[in-house]
């Protein structure tokens, strides 16, 4: 995401909101990411712009109230007439169903599109993957779902 931001390949005013079970601050997330983000000389200000476009909150995957709070956090950044939302899911199969259901029920955009990006493989085997795919199809239209291979990224 840093490279896309750095190279101006994302829409202006894009915001990044991290959501996970881990209770931590954005400063802690930033510190943990330092060793993975390559910053060339002269890009320090751009990196600060990137971090200013980030937010983080922790919550459970199975409690709708946490997703309602996530929706409030997202909404505070949506100032214009159009506000698209993309959810990138890199979650264990055990929480996939709860996470997608709560996104659908509490975090769908009312001012633009909602997309869900899912890292494959998801599920423990073909059978569980098929079950998760059917659940997903009941929550989102096919054009809202993007599947990517974790290893090919």
UniProtKB/Swiss-Prot annotation:
Belongs to the glucose-6-phosphate dehydrogenase family. One of its GO terms (biological process) is glucose metabolic process. Gene3D superfamilies: NAD(P)-binding Rossmann-like Domain. Pathway: Carbohydrate degradation; pentose phosphate pathway; D-ribulose 5-phosphate from D-glucose 6-phosphate (oxidative stage): step 1/3. NADP(+) binds at residues 21, 120. Cytosolic glucose-6-phosphate dehydrogenase that catalyzes the first and rate-limiting step of the oxidative branch within the pentose phosphate pathway/shunt, an alternative route to glycolysis for the dissimilation of carbohydrates and a major source of reducing power and metabolic intermediates for fatty acid and nucleic acid biosynthetic processes. Pfam families: G6PD_N. It is an enzyme of class 1 (oxidoreductase). Its EC number is 1.1.1.49. One of its GO terms (cellular component) is cytosol. This is Glucose-6-phosphate 1-dehydrogenase. The keyword Cytoplasm applies. It catalyses: D-glucose 6-phosphate + NADP(+) = 6-phospho-D-glucono-1,5-lactone + NADPH + H(+). Its main location: cytoplasm. InterPro entries: G6P_DH (IPR001282), G6P_DH_NAD-bd (IPR022674), NAD(P)-bd_dom_sf (IPR036291). PANTHER family: GLUCOSE-6-PHOSPHATE 1-DEHYDROGENASE, GLUCOSE-6-PHOSPHATE 1-DEHYDROGENASE G6PD. The lineage of its organism: Eukaryota, Metazoa, Ecdysozoa, Arthropoda, Hexapoda. Keywords: Carbohydrate metabolism, Cytoplasm, Glucose metabolism, NADP, Oxidoreductase. It is found in: Cytoplasm, Cytosol. One of its GO terms (molecular function) is glucose-6-phosphate dehydrogenase activity. D-glucose 6-phosphate binds at residue 120. The keyword Lipid biosynthesis does not apply.
